[in-house]
Amino acid sequence: VYIFDRLNQTAFRRNIQKKNLFNSTYLERRKNMYESWENLERDCLCCEKCNLCKTRTNVVFGVGNQNAEVLFIGEGPGQNEDLQGEPFVGRGGQLLDKMLKAIDLDRNKNIYIANIVKCRPPQNRDPLPEEQEACIGWLRNQVALIRPKIIVCLGRIAAMKIIKPDMKITKEHGIFFERNGLLMMATLHPAALLRNPRQKPDAFEDFLKLQKKINEICEHTYN
């Protein structure tokens, strides 16, 4: 059981108000929360909570600025990500980087990118509900440590897990939702844009809305 000193209690009361994520109170989760990024990443890299650990090459923990005000969340690693240990490095990742650059964002400077699941599902299938649930604790901890102001869900799976289970991404992408003190938005997954290039203008409109919102509430992202 995690024991807090008085200083930590004050900090955790603040987090309870701001970080009550994924349909769970912070106090219910506190015994599983990490205080340091290094310990979180170390344990995640050794995770064997579901069967995806048996087929992975690398755990794909995430990439970017650990103090980012904007957090992007995808569904899970693909083949290239599994081989390189970094999210969104294949063709979809290259497209994502171009879209980020268009609104002055950079995965290595002013945002963080993570996934719902940290290990590649075989044949790039959607992660199963039980796999998502086994892995979501790592993401909760990342969110609690990063403390972003905006979360952007890349694709249907992430949006349904993070924003709401009945999310209709084709109709509700680009709309901001407030959840537990955080602004959240979903946009189309880069892989979906590669399959259907006609949707690229819609996704770019989402990014322009994101840029406007960053300018409104994120004082450090562009500075």
What residue spans do the PLM features occupy?
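A polyanion-binding, active-site-adjacent surface
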Residues: 2-6, 22-223
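Charged/polar low-complexity intrinsically disordered segments
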Residues: 9, 14-19
